[in-house]
């Protein structure tokens, strides 16, 4: 018998259909961690769709669709999932841009419903009382005053450029804020960073 004689023709009907695998592949390390956690008698918490861990005011870590377990004795939680870095300032800027575009579109078309659908700014303002709106406006005017101070070019004489760059990177601030902070703290980089991160 030759190899050519052994080859049989297979039709599509004879090929078994592979079902789509909807199971999640779990890594070996995660499987070991889950086995250890199962020995701790943790209770699975249902209904949590997002976990947010705050690092600083501007930066947060978000875990979407996590598996959350709670200890039976205390108020401690164990969270499984992939953490993603999320920049709060970028998110806020994107929301402001979207709200501004929605207001501009509403002004051009004269339609209030489009602005309400695109941005929830109107609904948020309608639900606030006048005192909180006034407080928000005062806070916004104070931040505009701080921004105006930043726009004026600060004098960097007597300060090292490397110190200014270090403060800018670590505190995530503008060059003018870094210069003003270094002058306020007598060129002390550590105290300046701590002061600007508050």
From Swiss-Prot:
Pfam families: NAC, UBA_HYPK. Signal peptide: none annotated. The keyword Transcription does not apply. GO terms for molecular function: phosphatidic acid binding; phosphatidylinositol-3,5-bisphosphate binding; phosphatidylinositol-3-phosphate binding; phosphatidylinositol-4-phosphate binding; unfolded protein binding. Residues 159-198 form the UBA domain. GO terms for cellular component: cytoplasm; nascent polypeptide-associated complex; nucleus. Component of the nascent polypeptide-associated complex (NAC), a dynamic component of the ribosomal exit tunnel, protecting the emerging polypeptides from interaction with other cytoplasmic proteins to ensure appropriate nascent protein targeting. The NAC complex also promotes mitochondrial protein import by enhancing productive ribosome interactions with the outer mitochondrial membrane and blocks the inappropriate interaction of ribosomes translating non-secretory nascent polypeptides with translocation sites in the membrane of the endoplasmic reticulum. Part of the nascent polypeptide-associated complex (NAC), consisting of EGD2 and EGD1. NAC associates with ribosomes via EGD1. This is Nascent polypeptide-associated complex subunit alpha. The lineage of its organism: Eukaryota, Fungi, Dikarya, Ascomycota, Saccharomycotina.
């Amino acid at each position: 018998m030759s190899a050519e004689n052994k080859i049989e023709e297979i039709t599509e009907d004879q090929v078994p259909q592979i079902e789509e695998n909807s199971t999640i592949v779990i890594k070996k390390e995660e499987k070991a961690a889950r086995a250890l956690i199962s020995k701790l008698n943790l209770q699975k918490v249902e209904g949590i769709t997002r976990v947010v861990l705050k690092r600083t005011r501007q930066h947060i870590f978000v875990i979407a669709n996590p598996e959350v377990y709670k200890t039976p004795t205390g108020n401690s939680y164990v969270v499984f999932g992939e953490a993603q870095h999320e920049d709060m300032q970028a998110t806020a800027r994107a929301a402001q841009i979207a709200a501004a575009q929605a207001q501009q579109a509403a002004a051009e078309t004269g339609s209030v419903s489009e602005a309400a659908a695109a941005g929830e700014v109107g609904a948020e303002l309608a639900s606030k009382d006048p005192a909180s709106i006034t407080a928000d406006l005062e806070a916004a005017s104070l931040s505009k005053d701080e921004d105006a101070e930043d726009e004026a070019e600060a004098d960097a004489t007597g300060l090292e450029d490397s110190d200014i760059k270090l403060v800018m990177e670590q505190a995530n601030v503008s060059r003018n804020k870094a210069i003003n902070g270094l002058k306020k703290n007598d060129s002390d980089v550590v105290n300046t960073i701590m002061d600007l991160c508050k």
